[in-house]
Amino acid sequence: MKHGAGGRSMRLLIEQVLVDRTSPIANVMDDGAAIPLGDEWLIVTTDSHVIHPLVFPGGDIGRLAVAGTVNDLAMMGATEPLGLTCGLILEEGFPLDDLKTIRSSMERTCTEAGAPIVSGDTKVMGRGEVDGLVLNTTGVGIARRVVRDSGLKPGDLLIVTGTLGDHGIAVMAARHQLDLGGALQSDVAPLNSLIRAALLAGGDGISAMKDPTRGGAASALHEMAEKSGVGIQLDERALPVRDEVRAAAELLGLDPLMIANEGKALLGVHPDAADIVLRAVRAHPLGRDAAVIGVCSGELRGSVVLDTGFGRRLLTEPDGELLPRIC
């Protein structure tokens, strides 16, 4: 299970076994493929969703599938999706009313994101051969400029567009029927309009983007640092975490930096553009809690260092079954 939970094991599986080394497009290993199309780029991304439970506070597998694919497109600069495909694998006997509810949720999220479902496929397997429902979505969009997760430069500031750990904690509480107090809600949401606003404000001053899903911000930042050849220093005191999420994480022995998010983005921004980008993000309903959380340097390349206010320590890359089946 750890090879699908995000973090080092999953990254190594993809790098060493799954990626097509003969393809210069696939070998980049970003959130999607960028295919040249005249003076623009066709961005293609795909994602399969196996979350348990299928419905959780703040969302469900349908909203998650649409938002996750739209967000992967947006992270590469394609903020106006052309369309999505949807593949369903259903377990025999799956309740029709539940399927209608999930389908309605997908439709609402597609409308929210401006991303129509243009094609699909449905398969049914026997009882016990699949756990309820597996949902795959593929998305395509056009980008005028591709933004890679490998574009960080020394001196760039790191902005997170909101609070960390909301999705993972909400799903974990629902899965195990934990009464952790407070209003725990997933943050699952399509971010393309927020990212569009950030790109309009910051232009080329935005050097890199990534959504911190499986493995949380820690996994995403490690990947960005390694690909970009920079070191990252985080300010722990600047990390936005809701009180109820922090309390639940402490109770469960989890680090909010390693907990999945489904409605947040990490932006690498040139210092000259940081203020205007931060203002643009905070002006969006999904970015009100955005914060500058760190800076890139030429030291300790490929590493992430956490400044706690009392000292500094290396932030390890997540590995293992922290929160399996979280998306």
Go through the PLM ranges and name each one:
Residues T109-C110, A225, A249, V281:
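A generic structural signal for well-ordered alpha-helical segments
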Residues A5-D166, V171, L180:
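Glycine-rich phosphate/pyrophosphate-binding loop regions near the starts of catalytic domains
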Residues M29-D30, I259-K264:
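Short Gly/Ser/Thr- and Asp/Glu-enriched loop/turn motifs at secondary-structure junctions
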